[in-house]
């Protein structure tokens, strides 16, 4: 089957994308909404203690990194980036344009035959 207006090479990629999308939708429908509870035989096992420790670790890590996701951290990053890279951009750009122009004029003058370009024609 060819899709009108599409190349035949794109068809396998399209089929793969549709297959992946169908699998994702099917998997989402099979997952129950409630979180399953632990079986009674595992409640007193070392695995339940591990679950509590992991939950505590995740909570502490989330609290410690909360500053990173706040607006102050992003504003500080943007300010530091501006000061390090963009503050003197206008001056650097002007200097680069001047040096590029001078270099280009020098190259053009060196390629010019002596009969056509005299010393008075440099400007």
UniProtKB/Swiss-Prot annotation:
Location of this chain's protein in the cell: Secreted
Signal sequence annotation: 1-27
Sequence similarity: Belongs to the apolipoprotein C4 family.
UniProtKB keywords: Lipid transport, Secreted, Signal, Transport
Record-given protein name: Apolipoprotein C-IV
Role: May participate in lipoprotein metabolism.
Pfam families hit by this protein: APOC4
GO biological process, one term: positive regulation of triglyceride storage
UniProt xrefs under InterPro entries: APOC4 (IPR028120)
